[in-house]
Amino acid sequence: MTKDRLSALKAAQSEDEQDDDMHMDTGNAQYMEEFFEQVEEIRGSVDIIANNVEEVKKKHSAILSNPVNDQKTKEELDELMAVIKRAANKVRGKLKLIENAIDHDEQGAGNADLRIRKTQHSTLSRRFVEVMTDYNKTQTDYRERCKGRIQRQLDIAGKQVGDEDLEEMIESGNPGVFTQGIITDTQQAKQTLADIEARHNDIMKLESSIRELHDMFMDMAMLVESQGEMVDRIEYNVEHAKEFVDRAVADTKKAVQYQSKARRKKICILVTGVILITGLIIFILFYAKVL
């Protein structure tokens, strides 16, 4: 009686544990499904940022190739930069939430899902930093091109300025420093100064944008650098696992081929034996009738 009751209690406990495991598996599956939806959303946002960076490059070229001040293109450029800034801040915030969740879950036992989340987070972070690095380079390149444009226009206006002096004039933030000592009695001279002031204004906007994104950029870059070794190790293991699987598949195919050949040999031997035995029986019967 006592043994039966103990068995019943153990069976009930086992059922409860199975129910808990099933509930946990279902919860993990749903969590990972939501996680991958978030990953795809972030990846899509980063792709949009990358596309907008390409549009920024086109706007830069259009502005610099236009001899007159193109206000419409500049407004479109300002809007693109604002869109990139908003999207980048959102992506950074979402990546930060994932990072915090991973750090929290690392306090417990590690599992395959946690490793997957780490890898996905690191891959997204790397991609994001690559795109933002390209954007930062685009801005600094445009600054140098604007600076070169100012230098050429100053030369046209007859004002010789060295590179260091020009840099100081730009950093002063005062467009009036460019007009000192320049006679603006012709339309061409006025147009030249207007272009200089426009390029200087562009540089001021660029530097403001670069400063705004600098902290975010450095934060993400440091995160990616710290994750680099882990990701490289994971990629190495995955690559070697793939090679192992490929070799295993090839070996399996060879084994199947050898097995198939061996099977065919056995069948041929069996058929030959049957034919010989049948012929022998027919010969014996025929010989018996003759006798």
From Swiss-Prot:
Topology in the lipid bilayer: Single-pass type IV membrane protein
Alphabetically ordered keywords of this record: Cell membrane, Cell projection, Coiled coil, Cuticle, Developmental protein, Differentiation, Membrane, Neurogenesis, Neurotransmitter transport, Transmembrane, Transmembrane helix, Transport
Ranges annotated as spanning the membrane: 267-287
Phenotype of the disrupted gene, per the record: Worms exhibit defects in locomotion and postembryonic development. All mutants are resistant to the acetylcholinesterase inhibitor aldicarb indicating impaired cholinergic transmission.
Region: Disordered, residue numbers: 1-24
GO cellular component terms, A-Z: axon; basolateral plasma membrane; dendrite; endomembrane system; membrane; neuronal cell body; perikaryon; plasma membrane
The protein's name: Syntaxin-1A homolog
Gene behind this protein: unc-64
Consequence the record notes for mutating A248V: In e246; causes constitutive dauer formation, defects in locomotion and increases life span. Restores pharyngeal pumping in animals overexpressing lin-3
Ranges in a coiled coil: 69-95
InterPro entries (alphabetical): SNARE, Syntaxin, Syntaxin/epimorphin_CS, Syntaxin_N, T_SNARE_dom
Family in the record: Belongs to the syntaxin family.
Gene3D superfamilies found in the cross-reference section: 1.20.5.110, 1.20.58.70
Spans within the Cytoplasmic topological domain: 1-266
Expression (tissue specificity): Expressed throughout the head ganglion, nerve ring, ventral cord, dorsal cord, intestine, vulva and spermatheca.
Subcellular localization, as worded in the UniProt entry: Cell membrane; Cell projection, Axon; Cell projection, Dendrite; Perikaryon
Record Pfam families: SNARE (PF05739), Syntaxin (PF00804)
Quaternary context: Interacts (via N-terminus, in open or in closed conformation) with unc-18; the interaction is direct. Interaction in open conformation with unc-18 promotes synaptic vesicle docking and tethering. Interaction via N-terminus with unc-18 mediates the secretion of the neurotransmitter acetylcholine from cholinergic motor neurons. Interaction with unc-18 is reduced in the presence of unc-13.
